[in-house]
Amino acid sequence: MLTLKIFVYTVVTFFVSLFIFGFLSNDPGRNPGER
Protein backbone atom coordinates (compact mmCIF):
# COMPACT_ATOMS: atom_id res chain seq x y z
CA MET A 1 0.00 0.00 0.00
CA LEU A 2 2.84 2.36 0.84
CA THR A 3 4.60 1.50 -2.41
CA LEU A 4 1.42 2.25 -4.35
CA LYS A 5 1.08 5.62 -2.64
CA ILE A 6 4.70 6.50 -3.38
CA PHE A 7 4.24 5.43 -7.00
CA VAL A 8 1.09 7.54 -7.35
CA TYR A 9 2.77 10.58 -5.81
CA THR A 10 5.78 10.15 -8.12
CA VAL A 11 3.59 9.91 -11.23
CA VAL A 12 1.47 12.90 -10.20
CA THR A 13 4.54 15.02 -9.46
CA PHE A 14 6.12 13.96 -12.76
CA PHE A 15 3.04 14.88 -14.78
CA VAL A 16 2.54 18.18 -12.95
CA SER A 17 6.16 19.21 -13.49
CA LEU A 18 5.99 18.08 -17.12
CA PHE A 19 2.80 20.08 -17.67
CA ILE A 20 4.24 23.21 -16.04
CA PHE A 21 7.51 22.90 -17.97
CA GLY A 22 5.72 22.32 -21.26
CA PHE A 23 3.34 25.21 -20.64
CA LEU A 24 6.14 27.63 -19.78
CA SER A 25 8.37 26.54 -22.66
CA ASN A 26 5.64 26.30 -25.31
CA ASP A 27 3.54 29.32 -24.33
CA PRO A 28 5.47 31.91 -26.39
CA GLY A 29 6.06 29.49 -29.26
CA ARG A 30 2.59 28.00 -29.50
CA ASN A 31 0.93 31.18 -30.81
CA PRO A 32 3.58 33.68 -31.93
CA GLY A 33 1.12 35.51 -34.20
CA GLU A 34 -1.24 36.55 -31.44
CA ARG A 35 1.32 38.60 -29.49
Swiss-Prot record:
Main localization, broad class: plastid
Entry GO CC: chloroplast thylakoid membrane; photosystem II reaction center
UniProt membrane topology term: Single-pass membrane protein
Key words, A-Z: Chloroplast, Membrane, Photosynthesis, Photosystem II, Plastid, Reaction center, Thylakoid, Transmembrane, Transmembrane helix
Disulfide bond sites: none
One biological process term in Gene Ontology: photosynthesis
Annotated InterPro entries: PSII_PsbI, PSII_PsbI_sf
Localization terms from the record: Plastid, Chloroplast thylakoid membrane
Transmembrane segments: 4-24
Superkingdom of source: Eukaryota
Pfam families: PsbI
Subunit structure: PSII is composed of 1 copy each of membrane proteins PsbA, PsbB, PsbC, PsbD, PsbE, PsbF, PsbH, PsbI, PsbJ, PsbK, PsbL, PsbM, PsbT, PsbX, PsbY, PsbZ, Psb30/Ycf12, at least 3 peripheral proteins of the oxygen-evolving complex and a large number of cofactors. It forms dimeric complexes.
Described purpose of this protein according to its UniProt entry: One of the components of the core complex of photosystem II (PSII), required for its stability and/or assembly. PSII is a light-driven water:plastoquinone oxidoreductase that uses light energy to abstract electrons from H(2)O, generating O(2) and a proton gradient subsequently used for ATP formation. It consists of a core antenna complex that captures photons, and an electron transfer chain that converts photonic excitation into a charge separation.
Family (UniProt): Belongs to the PsbI family.
Stated name of the protein: Photosystem II reaction center protein I
Lineage, highest ranks first: Eukaryota, Viridiplantae, Chlorophyta, Ulvophyceae, Oltmannsiellopsidales
